[in-house]
């Protein structure tokens, strides 16, 4: 028995050594490979390596949150902070992230293991608790304001991937208090629609500015759940929503493109509504009202007038003699290209419109006008 244990320990030690060697190779290859090289070469994203200096907090590691964490890890994010208090169940296997062997583990622990395997350079910090309780809310608040890439600095972005309004209100209260930008996301109960929303305290509406009826009426969500009925879950809708969320998060973190304030998705007719929600001056969140005053007091950005483009040609050389003309400009192209000296020999039109003869033109111009009515013509035809 002792020999068998020793052999297993030796095998485990050998596997650990092999894994460490593979991780070292991954680190070396990652330094040589530039993330999103196509976007960098095409001048879409400048200095993409800044992604390694960013910290993102993800609240909720379920259907949307787990895929979001996976995408950010593959993009090379510097640090991820995960919040969730639930465990992996076999019912979660229709998601895109968890596997059956992880059943029973906390979602943050299972996610950390998988994400570390995908990209060992990403720092993963996990918190297995419910942020809506008083003590845990204080811990959550301290974490997002002091556990950034630099110790004592806030995170760069908070992503809400929770499935209940109570947690959304807690995130909203924390971000309003600390003036942190955050994204809210969600999938409908029937799993055929989803949305993302970018919330900037004071600039756009917070989650309490136009709350759902459940929140406005202080209704306990637990009383609304029907026994034996759970929310539908489609990995397609969750994957699409997570893709929108990460895409806009990257645009915000790396400062490229246009970040959507609100982007919806309806799978039944592929409808993508976009809008911007203004803050409510009578919001119930006092920190939201404070942020609105601060935003209004900020100096307005100076709009720089762009110089009108000149009419000079973009390229000095024009070896092929290509010219642009207005659509309504008369065409001077000859009907018979063989007689033209401006084009290569052997070219001809695929279709040459026949020219009207002088006789046809004269007949059309001198055609008699007949004032006979339709009734008279019908009477003449009947008498024939």
Curated annotation (Swiss-Prot):
ATP binds at residues 63, 84, 107, 130, 164. Disulfide bonds: none annotated. GO terms for cellular component: cytosol. Belongs to the ubiquitin-activating E1 family. UBA5 subfamily. E1-like enzyme which activates UFM1. GO terms for molecular function: ATP binding; metal ion binding; UFM1 activating enzyme activity. Zn(2+) binds at residues 206, 209, 283, 288. Keywords: ATP-binding, Metal-binding, Nucleotide-binding, Ubl conjugation pathway, Zinc. Residues 352-375 are annotated as: Disordered. GO terms for biological process: protein ufmylation. It holds the Pfam family ThiF. The active site is at residue 230. This is Ubiquitin-like modifier-activating enzyme 5.
